[in-house]
């Protein structure tokens, strides 16, 4: 084991654990955040919605530029079609603000999602 990583615990082959879900398979809230499965970037990618503040933490579902939603980075997205299709969930969440990992925050993302889907499903 490298001295650089001596404080890390070896996880073996199980790197991630599934999120808790109910009997119907709906993902359980975590600290007030509701997770939604949005595969495409990776098979288990999720976004989190904070309903009280109407904020989506979108991770790598999108990138953004100048307040506009953009496709995720192609070189780091396993299935672009699936990622784009999964982004339709934004229409149902009534968010006023979305944070992405790569780009600036986006205000009122629901107002952009139809155009985003139209442009990127060609």
PLM region descriptions:
Residues 55-57, 99:
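Residue-level marker for buried hydrophobic side chains located in beta-strands
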Residues 1-36, 78, 82-95:
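Metallo-beta-lactamase
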Residues 69-76:
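Short glycine-enriched, charge-decorated loop/helix-capping segments at active-site entrances
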Residues 49, 84-122:
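Divalent-metal (often Zn2+) His-rich catalytic cores of metallo-beta-lactamase-fold enzymes
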Residues 59, 64-68:
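Short acidic/His/Gly/Ser-rich catalytic and metal-binding motifs that mark active-site loops
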Residues 40-42, 60-61, 102-104:
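Active-site metal-binding loops of divalent metal-dependent hydrolases
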Residues 29, 48-52:
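Active-site beta-strand termini and strand-to-loop segments that position acidic
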Residues 34-46:
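Active-site glycine- and acidic-residue-rich loops that bind
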